[in-house]
């Protein structure tokens, strides 16, 4: 009898162990497959599962810093009275070697900035694999929807100050190897303002995702300065403004922006329409990785 009871107990313990293992394994598999896969990084890629970020909130009052200073969240910056904040992701970057910069501008409303644990953390993982820090600023526009493009002059002044701050904080960061990547309204700022007015700040290239229209009231840029500058436009084939979640016709904007710069002497303009993607599904982390790989 005791032998039977012992066997039953052993069997129950074995079943419990199998169940626990299955739950843990499924949780790990879910995490592995869900963190960065939706942004285009395969689940079996080590970069698809970055470590969690320091705790933050949407108020912008906290200034969380990782113990090794590899991640800085919500850092305040005042540039001639223009105030905003920014995140810096430097985890996994080797500062004994040349370090580049990816400056990533959020879309209207700053959702990505307020929720950095998803897309931004995955993009930082990609940037680090190219030995680049990821900088994610928040627009100094504090009214309404919070956009970059409604006050291009103020946004540009503040971003120039941010570049100076990065040089001061990270002396060996090469701001001559700075890629700008803008999504939606962030792409509009790059194409309307920075490329047309301050091309000297875009030293390595620019990536416009889900936007990036043609300037309408700006003088033509000097193509002799940046004729070979790589300019990329990526937009989803369904990003045509018919989705009630996004009435902005990014397809037209991207086409117009790419044509405008190409017609003004920029001969390294590339435009990609992502089949089946809309304004929200376009794989931004993969795009960043693909573009940086193309420069090697």
Predicted regions and their residues:
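Short substrate-entry loop that stabilizes the transition state in hydrolases
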Residues: 94-145
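Loop/turn elements at helix/coil->beta-strand transitions in domains of secreted/extracellular proteins
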Residues: 97-101, 129-135, 174-179, 199-206, ...
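Alpha/beta-hydrolase active-site loop
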Residues: 148-172
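The feature captures the conserved acid-bearing segment of alpha/beta-hydrolase catalytic domains
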Residues: 204-285, 289-293
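Primarily recognizes the serine-hydrolase "nucleophile elbow" in alpha/beta-hydrolase
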Residues: 169, 176-226
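Cell-envelope and extracellular/periplasmic
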Residues: 105-110, 167, 183, 190, ...
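A domain-start/cap signature at the N-terminus of enzymes
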Residues: 4-8, 13-101, 193, 256-259, ...
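Short, flexible/disordered intra-domain loops and linkers
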Residues: 112-117, 144-151, 240-252
């Amino acid at each position: 009898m005791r032998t039977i009871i012992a066997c039953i107990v052993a069997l129950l313990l074995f079943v419990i162990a199998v169940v626990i293992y299955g739950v843990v394994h499924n949780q790990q598999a879910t995490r592995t497959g869900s963190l960065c896969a939706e942004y285009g990084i395969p689940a079996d890629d080590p970069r698809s599962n970055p470590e969690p970020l320091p705790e933050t909130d949407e108020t912008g009052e906290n200034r969380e810093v990782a113990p090794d200073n590899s991640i800085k969240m919500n850092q305040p910056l005042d540039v001639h009275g223009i105030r905003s904040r920014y995140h810096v992701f430097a985890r996994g970057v080797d500062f004994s070697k040349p370090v580049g910069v990816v400056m990533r501008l959020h879309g209207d409303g700053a959702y990505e900035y307020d929720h950095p644990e998803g897309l931004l953390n995955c993009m930082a993982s990609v940037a680090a694999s190219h030995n680049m820090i990821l900088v994610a600023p928040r627009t100094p526009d504090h009214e309404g929807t919070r956009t970059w493009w409604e006050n291009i002059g103020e946004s540009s002044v503040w971003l120039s100050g941010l570049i100076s701050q990065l040089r001061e904080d990270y002396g060996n960061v090469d701001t001559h190897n700075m890629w700008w990547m803008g999504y939606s309204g962030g792409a509009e700022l790059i194409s309307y303002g920075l490329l047309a007015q301050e091309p000297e700040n875009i030293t390595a290239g620019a990536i416009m995702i889900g936007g990036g229209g043609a300037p309408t009231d700006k003088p033509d840029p000097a193509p002799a300065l940046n004729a070979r500058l790589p300019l990329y436009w990526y937009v989803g084939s369904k990003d045509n403004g018919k989705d009630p979640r996004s009435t902005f016709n990014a397809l037209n904007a991207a086409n117009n922006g790419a044509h405008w710069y190409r017609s003004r002497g920029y001969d390294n303009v590339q435009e990609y329409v992502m089949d089946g993607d809309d304004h929200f599904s376009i794989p931004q982390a993969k795009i960043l990785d693909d573009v940086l790989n193309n420069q090697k």
